[in-house]
């Protein structure tokens, strides 16, 4: 162990770790839970420190030697080699101060170590005076939240969603001529094609992509420069413009200064809104997964209209059983996302006066949702949707037995007579044709001329 110190005194930290006193105190007083601060946030904080050092250097607020030491240390950390030096949990102060200081301490000590100095000496690089210069945890942490959210959405979620949509589009084309019975209220309705049904799924996902894309607009606004409460105390003139410019280069994202720093620190409406769009996606995915599970139910005593890919045995007691495992896993992910949304909504209400104090749990839940959805969508696409096959015989049988084909006769016979045909066929276990002819409404030839399932599906969804 070695001694580190802060304003409250001496703290013992492991000799082989680069963090300092404030991180050590946080480990002692917030030792519960297994939910570590996401590395996406840690790396976003490191990027901010790198860009802040450059901006401070440009403005003459930080000498070139210290600037270069800080930048070099951040580059090493961003390689992933030092991830073990960021041990703190999400459960800490609601501003994320402990994690901000964890990053400051590791950068400072790594810079000192690389130049032959003594760990914990805070010389020549001080975690507060130099690494945290022109910053506050209150503006740095929300900035990191937005950076991590944008990069995770664009880097993993959107590509996974686009991939799933592409796979569903391919299935819509493959199933374009497979006529099936539609269902409303879980009951038989008029015919459609399986391709049309899949086109509806595709449209849902397309709309989700648009909503998620729109939600990025406000996530591009960064709080950096607001410092403690939004007034910008201790921020040199020109710092905001320069640090944003460097962050744009570092991330490749079109970040801009917050339109109002008091709002940027005291609320997280942009993240609440963005996660809302993820919740809509979760709702759409549950609908799609549930539909496909029902369509393949059976295989002999359910609907059995599609065949699932045979990925693994489905039961430890019933031999030969194949279950929609990917569908169920996806629905559990969506359940978690919907639960996260409730957590984020409540946490979003805790903007007490000038500072929201539930920042860590907001971004933890947000990133968990993004990562789970991205992984689950790819797995669902590759190991489930890609392998779906049509049970053509079952589709045809269900179409031929459906009573709702009588809807095609409504323009000819009227609603009341058609109702009599359907009810007679149901109660007497007759075909629609048999019931219609026995009632004397049409001949067999006339019935066949009007009831043609292939002409009842229209062209929608096949454009």
Swiss-Prot record:
EC class (word): lyase
Family statement: Belongs to the class-II fumarase/aspartase family. Fumarase subfamily.
Gene Ontology MF term list: fumarate hydratase activity
Something else known: There are 2 substrate-binding sites: the catalytic A site, and the non-catalytic B site that may play a role in the transfer of substrate or product between the active site and the solvent. Alternatively, the B site may bind allosteric effectors.
UniProt GO cellular component terms: cytoplasm
Top-rank lineage group of the source organism: Bacteria
The species this protein was found in: Chlamydia trachomatis serovar D (strain ATCC VR-885 / DSM 19411 / UW-3/Cx)
Chain sites annotated for binding substrate: 95-97, 126-129, 136-138, 184, 316, 321-323
UniProt protein name: Fumarate hydratase class II
Job of this protein: Involved in the TCA cycle. Catalyzes the stereospecific interconversion of fumarate to L-malate.
EC number(s) per entry: 4.2.1.2
UniProt keyword list: Cytoplasm, Lyase, Tricarboxylic acid cycle
Locations listed in the record: Cytoplasm
A single BP term in Gene Ontology: tricarboxylic acid cycle
Residue positions of the active site: 185, 315
Chain's gene name: fumC
Pathway as given in its UniProt record: Carbohydrate metabolism; tricarboxylic acid cycle; (S)-malate from fumarate: step 1/1
Subunit annotation: Homotetramer.
């Amino acid at each position: 162990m070695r001694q580190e110190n802060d304003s409250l005194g001496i703290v013992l930290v492991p000799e082989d770790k680069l963090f300092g006193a404030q991180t050590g105190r946080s480990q002692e007083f917030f030792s519960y839970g297994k939910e570590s601060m996401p590395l996406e946030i840690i790396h976003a904080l490191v990027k901010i420190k790198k860009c802040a050092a450059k901006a401070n250097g440009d403005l003459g607020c930080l000498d070139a030697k210290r600037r270069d030491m800080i930048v070099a240390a951040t580059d090493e950390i961003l390689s992933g080699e030092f991830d073990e030096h960021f041990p703190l949990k999400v459960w800490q102060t609601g501003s994320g101060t402990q994690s901000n200081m964890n990053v400051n301490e590791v950068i400072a000590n790594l810079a000192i170590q690389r130049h032959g100095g003594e760990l914990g000496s805070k010389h020549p690089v001080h975690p507060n005076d130099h690494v945290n210069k022109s910053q506050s945890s209150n503006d740095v942490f929300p900035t990191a939240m937005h950076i991590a959210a944008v990069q995770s959405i664009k880097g993993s979620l959107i590509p996974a969603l686009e991939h799933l949509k592409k796979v569903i589009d391919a299935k819509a084309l493959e199933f374009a001529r497979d006529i099936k019975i539609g269902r409303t209220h879980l009951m038989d309705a008029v015919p459609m094609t399986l391709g049309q049904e899949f086109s509806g799924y595709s449209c849902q996902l397309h709309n989700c992509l648009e909503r998620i894309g729109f939600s990025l607009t406000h996530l591009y606004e960064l709080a950096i420069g607001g410092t403690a409460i939004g007034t910008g105390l201790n921020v040199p003139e020109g710092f905001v413009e320069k640090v944003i410019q460097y962050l744009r280069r570092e991330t490749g994202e079109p970040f801009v200064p917050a339109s109002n720093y008091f709002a940027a620190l005291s609320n997280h409406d942009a993240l609440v809104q963005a996660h809302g769009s993820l919740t809509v996606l979760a709702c759409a995915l549950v609908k799609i997964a549930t539909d496909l599970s029902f369509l393949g139910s059976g295989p002999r005593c359910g609907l059995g209209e599609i065949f699932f890919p045979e990925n693994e045995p489905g039961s430890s007691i019933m031999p030969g059983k194949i279950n929609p495992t990917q569908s169920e896993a996806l629905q559990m992910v969506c359940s978690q996302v919907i639960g996260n949304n409730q957590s984020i909504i409540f946490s979003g209400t805790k903007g007490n006066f000038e500072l929201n104090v539930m920042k860590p749990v907001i971004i933890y839940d947000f990133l968990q949702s993004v990562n789970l959805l991205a992984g689950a969508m790819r797995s669902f696409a590759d190991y489930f949707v890609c392998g779906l096959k049509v049970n053509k015989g079952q589709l045809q049988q269900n179409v031929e037995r459906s009573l709702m084909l009588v809807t095609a006769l409504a323009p000819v016979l009227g609603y009341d007579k058609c109702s009599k045909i359907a009810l007679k066929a149901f109660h007497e276990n007759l075909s629609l044709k048999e019931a219609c002819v026995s009632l004397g409404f049409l001949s067999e030839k006339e019935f066949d001329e009007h009831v043609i399932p292939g002409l009842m599906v229209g062209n929608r969804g096949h454009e």
